């Protein structure tokens, strides 16, 4: 498990988050590490913030998907189901965090943690 249950602040999903959802999230993150060539024993402890966020948002997305009426075969509009709305939001978030993670994020090699893109610069002009 890559996050703490205390990190779950979503009032709608928190009571529904199951051990199976968390296990699926853990398997997903382990699979990402394997795709990046990182073996389980090389994953640093504690894990980096981007990995915790990825695992959390993936677990919440799975929880919302499982609770959604859209997956039960009922004929509904996507906008009518609060769980489906949450699923869409959390799917977007886990994909955003996944794009920021590299092998170095898992291992902490050379002090790199590519999950954060700092410093940021932006051109500012009048116009």
Where are these regions (language model features)?
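Elongated alpha-helical scaffolds
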Residues: 51-62
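Short loop/turn elements at secondary-structure junctions
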Residues: 61-127
